[in-house]
């Protein structure tokens, strides 16, 4: 075995982008790094894979109390003895896929400002934990050769658990689900590794103009609400593994308020005993908790226009429009139409005709809120080709939206409609698409599948113009964010 025990014929190199504020490796640091490596005491690798089952003692199985079928959406709903609901939808879309999704009311909105930083890293930290008798690293080794995973997540108003497996490893996925609810294990080593990785990633973030532009978008869009700010380096000083573990236990202590969907290629009969063994056996005495509406949005007309030093001068613009609207399938479809049509209009006018941008697109969609409402949000974002074309690009964008509120090209609408119908047929054969369909149906009572194509077919160019005029422009909310080079 060859080792380098002196500096003869040794060259150490470091490559880094030259930028103000960036910390570089100097000669002293490089020498110290080499010395640290040589001083390490290395031991031979030992395979310490644990030769034991994931669950040392299986829980007493629960029971299925009731079964009902939904013939419209093609699933079977099971009511379990612990109060949990399980929805089974067998498909043949992918031979090697079974998907798990669980959801219950709760989420980040239940926690105040003292936990904002913890909320930003919750998903990372919770999934760096161990399970049962296994550390995170030991768990990875124990699962080698298996295709099964489960993870926890907190949305703004929902506690969620997601997983996937092959049919062969379905029971392993169910065991992982059980352990996430009952035996989440604090793993300081894995947590510290995560924090170190985040520190490295975020260290030079603020030096990037794109990050500063993103921060301005968050601040403007969410009305400077500190809950809605991106993860930055200083957040890492305010996070606590103990607190994150406590929150995880609070949100995932019991399963009685959860609905679990299992979709994919599984055996209809053998899955029921697994449901009883690993889901019906979970604790089930938690009171339902509905979280408050936490999202705040800008209102009225506003502009954030600032300059930043850039090595390569490249301005950015972002425009936001919209307001509150009823959360319905028709409005969701109309929003999608508006976004696609505006994208095509802007691409031609701002990029192709004016040459003012490298690329431009419009996203228009509904962000669900409480009590059957949603926030209709139009987002137009673009890097501008030349600093002197910023105002021109905005003027053209504003004119295009105003003109679209009066009339849109029927041929353009026909192309969008054809794409929507084609995508609907493709998506109908995807397990993750059915997860979304069932989630919307169970949480908001909206069937986004049965009437979808019928509504898409019926939309006319006049409908789209009326939607842009009445539901976008008439709201009177218009936010422009502009970042120019110094």
Outline where the language-model segments fall.
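Proteolytic maturation boundary segments
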Residues: 1-113, 256-261, 266-309, 322, ...
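Conserved alpha/beta enzyme-core scaffolds, especially Rossmann-like or related mixed alpha/beta domains
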Residues: 251-253
